[in-house]
Amino acid sequence: MRTLIIIAAICLLTATGSGRAAANETLTDFISAQGCAIGPATLVRAAEAGHGHDAIDALIKQADATDETIRTGDWIVLPSSICRIQPPDVHSKIQITDPEVAALTSDIDGYAKLGDRGCFLDGPGLMERVQVTRGWDRNRANLEYMRFLAENLRTGDLAFYTNDPLSTPPGFQILRGDCADVPEIDAIRQSQALRDREFDALIREDAANVICGRDDSPSYRFMDLVMRRTRGENTNAWMVFEVKIMTIGGGWYVGNSATQKGTPRPPLCRFQ
């Protein structure tokens, strides 16, 4: 399988005509944000980013020296000793400063009567708005919106937060400028830090419960893992939802569209 993967990488690099990666990004940095998973989808992205097949081959050989490397289907998941899984690094054509975002964001006291202080985004409204303002179809609007969420959850400019598991936030909460002046800001920042600190361990441990192409990720056990890994320090009852949105927006799901959620790919799951 390794030989097939390397051949695929060579072909992809030839097709893109690029053998040089961005000077400020190593292959390991790139793969970390792809879930430390080397397979068909990430090989395409690695080639587009200019990472050569020799470097990919060397990384796989390094992983071969450990017993922790996972091979599942056409994928190789590198061990944490070589590569730590990071939240997906993705960039959307929708920016948080765009006028469409501002128009669909509530005032900070817009939901005060419901007991929620914060600037909440009307996500469905935003997807409809960019179809009009940018001429996108539903699938393009969905793709860029999911990327927008993943990008800004990663940077901490968005959150989906409440400490009450029986309550649902009004929407994704923007945490920039005056919109960050909310009572829960310290707890939100702590939950974001815990999420990112434990991202590698949580994804790897949860993947054993998820079958690629069949089951959902994160699994029903994810929040139990969160509480154990953070020793009960996490207060965000919706961390699992944030992680799911980040991985979908990061392209770790196959077949996601305006009408289909898609299915997870490694490292989120294992093939049977």
Residue ranges and their predicted role:
Residues Q34-E48, G115-Q131, S219:
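Short acidic, hydrophobic short linear motifs in intrinsically disordered regions
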Residues G50-A65, W136-F148:
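Short amphipathic alpha-helical interaction segments
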